[in-house]
């Protein structure tokens, strides 16, 4: 949620920045007109209150002079009734403005590239060498099926499309990756491990920005106002909702493993095969609560933590700075890590690392005090995938495939796999 004071002070400037997102900003325009109406109502209320006070003094004077004041008393009552009606109008306007604020996206940071499509995203750096196979590389779903480690056909029978049934060494690989990532972020990067609920309430989904705009993308529990989480970002960020932290607590860093559930409503026809785009998938999340002046340094740090996973797995990747049109609703700045997928001959997203500044903190009311009796300020929140596990499985299968159909297991994972060195049929 944007700072309403900032919006009122620099409406034209914010509108100009939001227009670079290429989104419908009619809600912002409506906010401007409603806010002006609200200002006019406030002026009218103040005028009426001033008149009521004046009439009250005149009534008192007439009574002291033992003169008739009935006409003024009636006027005072009429004015009070009008004020009461305008107060109700103000209440309704404030509710409408609050709802409009919830639907306005975050303002892009000045360092975010301006662009109209994903083609305008900017490559920041690359790491690792793209493999040069002496054979035609196979897609991960074909490799996994041939090895019997992921069963897509039976998953479709049990549930439907965009689900996977991990089996045997495949299930063990998924678990090994989760443990490896969690150990790395806890032991080496200093994150506190948390295990969140997979169901959250409407207030939590609103706090992190999934609601109200993206409700159709969420899985909702029938007859309960609960939602299956689309990412651990939701429960973990809301861990400190409606709290005032102390400055010495910051930065707070959490890492969480969770299952994630997404309807992929806008992805019809995209990535219908394999592990890239699933309705249910595992992910290790990184969430940080920081002081505002530190948040962009913290974004670089968090992004580096996600990169370290790929480096230790020796998977080639690149870091992209997402342009204004590809930024997402809540972020002021976002990096995507894209891992090399040989069968597609391209890089694919495996992590997004975002700085939301105070956008989520305002929605979730998360503050901190620099001094014990100081004014409470909103924290800045950041999050990133560290990493999406299914996509990491896909990248390992494709980048470590051998001509005979076997898959070499990355060395860093072998202790988690009981010393296993390769997958073979």
Curated annotation (Swiss-Prot):
Its EC number is 6.1.1.11. Its main location: cytoplasm. It is found in: Cytoplasm. InterPro entries: aa-tRNA-synt_IIb (IPR002314), aa-tRNA-synth_II (IPR006195), aa-tRNA-synth_II/BPL/LPL (IPR045864), Ser-tRNA-ligase_type_1 (IPR002317), Ser-tRNA-synth_1_N (IPR015866), SerRS_1_N_sf (IPR042103), SerRS_core (IPR033729), tRNA-bd_arm (IPR010978). It catalyses: tRNA(Ser) + L-serine + ATP = L-seryl-tRNA(Ser) + AMP + diphosphate + H(+); tRNA(Sec) + L-serine + ATP = L-seryl-tRNA(Sec) + AMP + diphosphate + H(+). One of its GO terms (biological process) is seryl-tRNA aminoacylation. It holds the Pfam family Seryl_tRNA_N. Catalyzes the attachment of serine to tRNA(Ser). Is also able to aminoacylate tRNA(Sec) with serine, to form the misacylated tRNA L-seryl-tRNA(Sec), which will be further converted into selenocysteinyl-tRNA(Sec). Belongs to the class-II aminoacyl-tRNA synthetase family. Type-1 seryl-tRNA synthetase subfamily. This is Serine--tRNA ligase. It comes from Halalkalibacterium halodurans (strain ATCC BAA-125 / DSM 18197 / FERM 7344 / JCM 9153 / C-125) (Bacillus halodurans). The gene is serS.
């Amino acid at each position: 949620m944007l700072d309403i004071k900032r919006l009122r002070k620099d409406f034209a400037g914010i509108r100009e920045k939001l227009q670079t997102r290429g989104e419908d900003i009619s809600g912002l325009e409506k906010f401007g007109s409603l806010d002006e109406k609200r200002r006019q109502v406030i002026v009218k209320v103040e005028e009426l209150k001033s008149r009521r006070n004046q009439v009250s003094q005149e009534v008192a004077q007439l009574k002291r002079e033992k003169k008739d004041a009935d006409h003024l008393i009636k006027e005072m009552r009429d004015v009070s009734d009008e004020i009461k009606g305008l107060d109700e109008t103000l209440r309704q306007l404030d509710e409408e403005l609050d709802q409009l604020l919830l639907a306005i996206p975050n303002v892009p940071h000045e360092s975010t590239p301006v662009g109209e499509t994903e083609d305008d995203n900017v490559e920041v750096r690359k790491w690792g060498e793209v493999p040069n196979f002496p054979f035609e590389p196979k897609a991960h779903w074909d490799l996994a099926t041939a090895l019997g480690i992921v069963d897509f056909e039976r998953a479709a029978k049990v549930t439907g499309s965009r689900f996977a049934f991990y089996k045997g060494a495949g299930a063990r690989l998924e678990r090994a990756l989760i443990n490896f990532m969690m150990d790395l972020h806890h032991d080496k990067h200093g994150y506190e491990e948390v295990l969140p609920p997979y169901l959250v309430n409407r207030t939590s989904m609103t706090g992190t920005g999934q609601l109200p705009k993206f409700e159709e993308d969420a899985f909702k529990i029938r007859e309960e106002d609960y939602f299956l989480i689309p990412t651990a970002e939701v429960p973990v960020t809301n861990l400190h909702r409606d709290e005032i932290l102390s400055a010495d607590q910051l930065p707070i860093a959490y890492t969480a493993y969770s299952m994630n559930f997404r309807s992929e409503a806008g992805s019809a026809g995209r990535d219908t095969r394999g592990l890239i785009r699933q309705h249910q998938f595992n992910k290790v999340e990184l969430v940080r609560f920081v002081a505002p002046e530190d948040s962009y340094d913290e974004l670089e740090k968090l992004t580096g933590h996600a990169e370290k996973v790929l480096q230790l797995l020796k998977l080639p990747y690149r870091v992209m700075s997402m342009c204004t049109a590809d930024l997402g609703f809540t972020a002021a700045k976002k990096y995507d890590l894209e891992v090399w997928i040989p069968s597609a001959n391209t890089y694919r997203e495996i992590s997004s690392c975002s700085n939301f500044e105070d956008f989520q903190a305002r929605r979730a009311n998360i503050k901190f005090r620099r001094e014990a009796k100081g004014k409470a300020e909103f924290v800045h929140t950041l999050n990133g995938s560290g990493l999406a596990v299914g996509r990491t499985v896909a990248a390992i299968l494709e980048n470590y495939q051998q001509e005979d159909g076997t898959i070499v297991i990355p060395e860093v994972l072998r202790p988690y796999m009981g010393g296993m060195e390769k997958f073979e049929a």
